[in-house]
Amino acid sequence: MMAAANGFSRIPMPTWRWLGVNDLPVPEGLTLPSVPIQLSAATGERVHHVAELRDSGVQEIEVTVADGAELSLTYIQLVPTDVSAASRIRAAVGKGGRFSCTLVEAGAQHTASELQVTLAGDDACADVWGLYFGDDARKIDLNYIIRQEGQHTDANMQVRGALLGHCVKNFRGTLDFIQGARGSVGKEDEEVVILSPHAHNRSVPLMLSHEGDVDGHHAVSIGRMDADKMFYLMSRGLDERAAQQLIVEASFAPVLARITDETLRTEIGDYLERRLLGGTQGE
């Protein structure tokens, strides 16, 4: 998969150029590191890693999951909201291997993130859950891809997001069934809550199939705060921002529940709460 000259990621099957979603550019002033972080799980091994990006810059991670191994990765991006960040995670999963990934993209003025998982072996599995949050005039650019090459592979991609203020967000989610991936199944679902009429949302769900004997499903749910729902919540004693916070927290809960480090999970929850209560909704 070739990326554009000014970027580092591209959707597997480019669409109309005028949509502006084919390529994912690196934020201005950032370059990818020459040596990525290497993570691996040997045959029969079960390992868990946490990767955090808290300063402006770029992080690249390469993951190798051997036959019959399991690797779980939690990736947290809490970069200060006045600087940019970019990340790339690529994982290869062997026969009977399992890769679980939980991603939180909550910081940065401009964030660009690629996740590419290749289920190379038969019976390989990928379970991906992602969360993004944008407010003010921030830009979020995400490209998540699961390639299913082996037979009887299983892919699950679940993404939850919330947009406030004048935030601009592009999310590309792809399930790519390669020829020979007979008996494979895949599910992709993105749910985004839009809390401002000025937020700009682009969702690009793709399901590509070069194999007939597969079962794939993808969906996007875009929710806006309607007057009736807001009236109901406020009639129960909540002000507008507290009502919005309740809805967003309910959406994010399944993703945050996967973070086993209680201290880290609490930190992220508190961080999102401060942003929700202090951010701009309809200005």
Task: Report the location of each language-model feature.
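Short, Lys/Arg-enriched, disordered terminal segments
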Residues: 3, 282-283
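Aromatic-residue hotspot detector
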Residues: 16, 171, 251-252
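Short cationic/low-complexity microdomains
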Residues: 19-21, 181-182, 247-248
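Membrane-helix cytosolic exit motif
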Residues: 252, 256, 264-265
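Extended amphipathic alpha-helical segments enriched in small hydrophobics
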Residues: 229-254
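Conserved beta-strand/loop scaffold segments within soluble protein domains that form the structured core
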Residues: 26-231, 235-238, 259, 265-282
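Alpha-helical protein-protein interaction elements
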Residues: 8-10, 41, 67, 244
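Long, low-complexity, mixed-charge
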Residues: 1-36
